[in-house]
């Protein structure tokens, strides 16, 4: 599994904070690229509708 990029992790953290989630609840540094991408897509859908 290819690990999530630093950019993916940083963007996911930004979205999580904007939505009021605790970043510590998400193992971002352990996620793969695909998993991080899906999380980002889900967070964007929640934030932007």
Regions found by a protein language model. Name each.
Residues 1-49:
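A charge-rich, low-complexity, intrinsically flexible signal that marks solvent-exposed coils, linkers
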């Amino acid at each position: 599994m290819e690990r999530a990029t630093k950019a993916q992790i940083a963007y996911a953290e930004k979205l999580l904070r904007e939505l009021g989630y605790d970043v510590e609840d998400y193992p971002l540094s352990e996620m793969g690229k695909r998993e991080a991408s899906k999380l980002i897509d889900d967070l964007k859908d929640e934030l932007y509708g």
